[in-house]
């Protein structure tokens, strides 16, 4: 009886803990020569996916954080897992007027 109850508790708690550990996924669109949204706040462990919906190639480049997506051709995506807290300003290396901020809490 005790063993069955323990297994039931583990099965109820483990999926929740696993989902929390994996973090959430957030989307940033690249369109109209902008990052949309331009500012996004995420938690440590969350994933941010930038998808290029523009007709030009773009990048996600944060020099201070040493983050670089490489060139993203139209319709391509890039994933980044936020591991360090703080503010990460970034630009498109190909079009430096395009700016965004990733805030990791």
Where are the regions a protein language model picked out?
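Extracytoplasmic copper-binding redox domains, predominantly the cupredoxin/blue-copper superfamily
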Residues: 2, 10, 17-105
């Amino acid at each position: 009886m005790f063993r069955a109850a323990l297994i039931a508790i583990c099965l109820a708690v483990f999926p929740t803990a696993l989902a929390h550990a994996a973090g959430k996924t957030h989307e940033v669109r690249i369109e109209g020569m902008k990052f949309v949204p331009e500012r996004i706040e995420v938690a440590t462990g969350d994933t941010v996916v930038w998808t290029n919906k523009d007709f030009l190639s773009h990048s996600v480049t944060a020099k201070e954080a040493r983050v670089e997506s490489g060139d993203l051709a139209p319709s391509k995506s890039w994933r980044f897992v936020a591991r360090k807290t703080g503010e990460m300003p970034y630009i498109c290396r190909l079009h430096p007027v395009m700016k965004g901020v990733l805030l990791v809490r």
